[in-house]
């Protein structure tokens, strides 16, 4: 969806990620039939109360990875299901801890280009998987689509998922 994903740092991260997810769904709904089911999501990384979105440059990616190195942070995914004019949004949270990263590892990872389109400058499902020393919560939240929560939201709307 073509929306402004800018987040207000003065507002709670949970509120902002939910807002962006819901705005994405509403933007798509304009081109859909009312009975269509629209699923949207937005993911952010939060450390020390600071929202880390997608890096703006390689230098920004390096800055983010240095900030996350050896520390615990939280990934939040806002998930919205919209159909029949009814919208529901939930925020799923997962705690992640990175081991200490070397400058060489960070530079090599950024050089792959992989972190450039990912919140917090890393993809847990890719090369950055070797950075994760601990995960507390939903792995799929970190990937950007918490499928267990999505399935529950769809079931509440009468949509059968796997029987």
At which residue positions do the language-model features occur?
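Anionic-ligand binding patches
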Residues: 9-163
């Amino acid at each position: 969806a073509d929306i402004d994903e800018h987040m207000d740092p003065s507002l709670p991260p949970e509120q902002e990620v939910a807002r962006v997810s819901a705005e994405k769904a509403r933007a798509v709904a304009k081109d859909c039939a009312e009975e269509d089911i629209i699923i949207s999501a937005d993911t952010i990384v939060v450390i020390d109360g600071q929202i880390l979105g997608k890096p703006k440059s390689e230098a920004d990616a390096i800055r983010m990875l240095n900030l996350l190195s050896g520390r615990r942070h939280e990934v939040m995914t806002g998930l919205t299901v919209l159909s029949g004019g009814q919208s529901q949004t939930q925020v799923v949270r997962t705690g992640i801890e990175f081991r200490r990263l070397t400058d060489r590892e960070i530079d090599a990872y950024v050089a792959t280009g992989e972190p450039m389109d990912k919140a917090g400058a890393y993809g847990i499902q890719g090369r950055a998987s070797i950075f994760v020393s601990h995960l507390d919560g939903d792995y799929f939240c970190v990937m950007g689509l918490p499928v267990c929560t999505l399935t529950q939201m769809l079931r509440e709307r009468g949509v059968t998922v796997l029987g």
